[in-house]
Structure formats: structure tokens, C-alpha cells
Amino acid sequence: MDSLAEQPSPDLPTLERMARMRKLWQWLALLVVSLLFAGALELAALPAALLIGPMLAAIVAGTNGATVRVPRLLFGAAQAIVGCLVAASISADIFPVFYREWPLFLGVVVATVTASSLLGWLISRWRILPGTTAVWGSSPGAATAMVLMAGAFGADQRLVAFMQYLRVIFVSMTAALVAKMWVDTSGIEIPPIIWFPPIDAQAFAATIGIALVGGLSGKICRLPSPYFLGTFIFGGVIHLGLGVEMQLPPWLLAISYAMVGWSIGLNFTRAILRHATRALPQIIASIVALIAFCGGLAFMISHLLGIDPLTAYLATSPGGMDSIAIIAAAAQNVDISFVMALQSARFLIVLLVGPSVARLVARSVRQ
């Protein structure tokens, strides 16, 4: 993760607009623009608005010469909170459904990971994006986790984030459009965010304790992306093994997402942004191809096993789990337990095997 602590780009002399501002004013400008972007994305009901908004604001700042950087300690703490979020999101309820349907679930996940890895391999092979970036960026889920881990394995986090969050937006919007073919979701309202809920002292203390112990354990064990992975592993064991509940209030998540978004976005330069823009058609084509492939899997599952078409589509959708859950809850005939079990299984397997698959595909690209 040290790659995010880079010094300002050598391009800086030509980008003096923000560099001439005092650091306090740079932070203030970044905060205001982040709030505007995040608010606009929330109003548009786009996924991951609280992370994408600050990241877009930081990209604007970074490409205009901003010299401020998120301190490593704050970035590490933000990663630990995201690790707690991922650990807390894994429900023990998925395991009975997974046990009952494991051949189907495993087949779908393996097929999806294989397809996404092939697309990443092609983008890398054609030198559209550098190194292993495309392999990490093509991962079908766990977007924030993949971005956090990518830097530790030598990929360009900025371009990985660009690919991953573009996929999240495309997948979520496509799922919403497909759902409208089966059910009218126009009357369904997303519940408002309660920014400052009552604090459960025990659950909140457990969250902070897990973040501290998990982050330190990851550092001691020299894990890649130690604060995230250490907290995720430790938190998963405590949450699933001991039944300890964690509380992650929205204000804490918003701060953590902003730290992650700023850390990535502030390291964008105009050269990187131009590179991402040039690669945009191929990246969009790969996302559309992955969505179409998963749609084909859903069609096969629906026809061969008699599963409701919308249930099959939502279950096999490559990412956007939060948005998928909202859409599934809005449809009366959807088997939400099946959808969330398969989505959670894909998320968990991608998280566990993603780094190994990325290294394997990257090695074949170099050969």
C-alpha cells in the first residue's frame, strides 16, 4: 500500500492551479467538491456514491496539481474499517443454502471468474493497460477489496479503481433495467440513510477492537494490504465463529470511504487520466461482455433447473451486491435467499482466490 504515499507527480510544474493554494484550502476545496459529487451520485441512486464521489473529487484535484495526501495512518484505519464491513457482511445464513446447492454455486462462480480472468488477460495481452492492472480490474466483485489489495501486488490502483467502479455502475444499472422487464420497481424507495444512529456500545467497541487487532495482526504477519486483509480475516473469525456483532454507523463508513477515495484519486495525473480515457472503449466492451456472459449463465440455469429467470439473473450478476439486494427485495417472485447466497458465495470466493488467480494470469501474460 506504500504506493499511495507517493510524492506529487513530476507533472506538477505544469499543473500549478491547486499547488499554489495553501494545504488547508486544498483540503477544504476537496471536501466541498467531494460532498457535491457524493450528494449528486446519491440523488441519482448510483452505487458506491460515498466512495466514488470523493474519488472523482480527488481525481479533479490530483490532475490540477493538488499536493495534499491522506496520511498513511488514516488510510490504514480506513482500510481496517472496510475490512470490518466485509467481515460483518458475511452471514452464516448463506451456508445452509450453499451446502444444498454447492455444485451449482461453485460452477457459476468458477465460470464467472474464468470469464473475467480471460477478459483481463486479453486486455493485458493487447497492452491496453499496463502490467497486472487489467487482471485486478476485471475481477467480478469485491470492488473495494480488489482495489485495496491490487497495489500490494504491483498493479496500478488508480486504473484498477477506474475499472472496478465502472463495472459496479454498469452491473447495477443493467440489473435495474432487467428487473423492470419482470416487475415494476418504480414505487420502491431506497430507505433514507440514518447518518447518526444510536450507538450500541458493545457492538461499536467490538468494531474498533477488531479493526485495531486485525490491522496490527496483518502488519505483524506481513500480509499484503495488511490493514484490510488482517481485519477481514480476524473479523470473519470473530463474527462467524463467536457470533460477535459489529456496528458500522454510516458516518464512520462515509469517512472511511472518503479516505480510500481520496488516497486513490489524489495520485491521478493527467497522463494516467488520458491513459484511462484511451482505454475506456475496451474497458466498457469487457464489462458488457462479462454482463452478457453472466446473463447467458442465468438463461441456462433458468431453463435447465426451472429457476425463475429474474432470480437466476440477479443471482449470477457479476457484482453490485448491495444494489442487487434492493432489486431482489422489490420483486415478489424472486427467491432472495438463493440470490444473496450465490452473490455472497461469489464475493467470498473472489476475495479468497482473487489474488492467486490474478498472479497466475499475470504470469501467463508475461510469458
Task: Mark where each language-model region is.
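Structural signature of multi-pass alpha-helical membrane transport proteins
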Residues: 3-74, 78-94, 115, 198, ...
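Cytoplasmic-side transmembrane-helix entry/capping segments in multi-pass membrane proteins
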Residues: 71-83, 102-107, 128-139, 161-166, ...
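Membrane-interface helix termini and inter-helical loops of multi-pass transporters
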Residues: 92-100, 181-199, 242-250, 274, ...
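Membrane-embedded alpha-helical segments of transport systems
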Residues: 141-146, 161-182, 293, 322-323, ...
